[in-house]
From Swiss-Prot:
Annotated cofactor note: Binds 1 zinc ion per subunit.
Name listed for the protein in its UniProt record: Threonine--tRNA ligase
CDD domains the UniProt entry points to: TGS_ThrRS (cd01667), ThrRS_anticodon (cd00860), ThrRS_core (cd00771)
Keywords assigned by UniProt, alphabetized: Aminoacyl-tRNA synthetase, ATP-binding, Cytoplasm, Ligase, Metal-binding, Nucleotide-binding, Protein biosynthesis, RNA-binding, tRNA-binding, Zinc
The keyword tRNA-binding is annotated on this UniProt entry: yes
Subunit architecture: Homodimer.
Amino acid sequence: MPVITLPDGSKREFANAVSTLDVAADIGPGLAKACIAGRVNGELKDACDLIETDVDLAIITVKDDEGVEILRHSCAHLLGHAIKQMWPETKMAIGPVIDNGFYYDVDLDHKLTEEDVAELEKRMLALAKTNYDVVKRVVSWQEARDTFESRGESYKMAILDENISKDDQPALYHHEEYTDMCRGPHVPNMKFCHHFKLMSVAGAYWRGNSDNKMLQRIYGTAWADKKALKAHLTRLEEAAKRDHRKIGKQLDLYHMQEEAPGMVFWHNDGWSLFLELERFIRQKLGQYTYQEVKGPLMMDRVLWERSGHWDKYSEAMFTTHSENREYAVKPMNCPGHVQIFNQGLKSYRDLPLRMAEFGCCHRNEPSGSLHGLMRVRGFTQDDAHIFCTEEQVQQEVSGCIKMVYDTYATFGFHDIVVKLSTRPEKRIGDDAMWDRAEQALMDALKANDIEYEILPGEGAFYGPKIEFTLHDCLDRAWQCGTVQLDYALPGRLGATYVAEDNSRQTPVMIHRAILGSLERFLGILIEEYAGKFPTWLAPVQAVVMNITDKQSEYVDEVVKLFKDQGIRASKDLRNEKIGFKIREHTLRRVPYLLVVGDQEMENREVAVRTRDGVDLGKIKIDQFAAMVKEQISLRSLNLLEE
């Protein structure tokens, strides 16, 4: 007689084993109709799974995040159902849930076109609208293998052979004549899967290994209702308009090419952005009393072995040989910073020692994962490492948190999600050390009034960490900042200091990044601002345009005056109509468009309009320069107003 305890604390007793769907029906027909699955003692289960003992039960519907994830997973199976009807020879690989949707990797000789994808989507919708039941069967390993062998599903057989124990009982989900294998849970009926769209097709190697066959990966998105689907597609349209690769080309900021995959060729205006970002962070380093250092680009393999990186990261490291020695281009800066710390005897009085570098790093990312500035092989980190005593950890972490929030606020990012990753199962040090480390991070977060989520067991083996994820104007999440405690690397590389009692002690090392990769952060900013950078960051802050040749010398004078005062100004003396010039520089997103005719020249003025079309009227050149300089010094996010 199972007793079911619901989230509100109420209990329901049943004479026999029941399913989540039975419990929902006992509560009411509306809930039974909406029930997708159940959370039984914290674990998601299919709505049809029997409950035989006393449990805590939460009934999952599409109003729950888990419910939406479940219907997305079922849409992946629906895709399998449809593609097997249209191309029966297709071999199905894997079809997981991803952010906002799902994908399925398929082995199909026919190369799918846009027209094929549109027809596939129609077939999926036609199948879903029949509202057929999804039938779950738990079978023996052998029955599952026999099922897929009879259907020629070689990838499903490989998953069974390589990933599932013969003692296990896999779950098969039957979508009419189509059968798939999955941990589940899945929707009980396809009435929940009416609001989806197939988005694109890409190549993907089986198991992510380039030695294996290239499959076709079909991406889709799925939502609980029509309104949510439409809102998501609208966000995607806006994101496409803001795509940093598209805007980067329009504004002539940078380019990538095949001869240097994942490496950025910065053009003049793009490099101006990069340097301004670096200048801003360098100013922050001064405010928070960091030393700035520069380490070598590559170091002997021996050092990477001592640091432990060779064992963990060698596949992602670029290597070269010279004079019978093997070198690795650095994928990160920390071992180099320990070498600088180790030069000369350090005392406890020298701590904390804050060491920062704009470190040029390289990682051999898979070519298929490269994506504009967001995922590159060569990148610059705003990296820092703080060497301190254990007693100083909380204060130093608190300083890092302040720096992160100060920095993000300058760019207009205020919606920051903070996560604290705690001790993993495999770790160095004793529980007392981890207790102190985790408490220090929690105290630092509390001191800064920061709400945070704890991720149990997600810390590195050498220490807990804090992650900062910012949300942009399209509500996309970007994990940028990290504060990571490290109790291992200093000891591995022989870092010590003389303590107050004259003993030799190993410092705690704090890895700190705020922007992360400057390239990636610039990609985020390009999309956040849609290329309309704040004045302080804009490559060209003002462009001065003449109406006729008579004003050419005056334009030169105005531009020189602006440049002498630190304003990035340019001129446009082309023999074109002024309306044409204004349109062109508006498309270049220049913050201020300054027009001079005879009257402006006579009165030593400029006629000012913003890139958004706001007419600020005629302003004396000295006054305008002072106004813009103030904007720049304040790093204002807004343009001047009427």
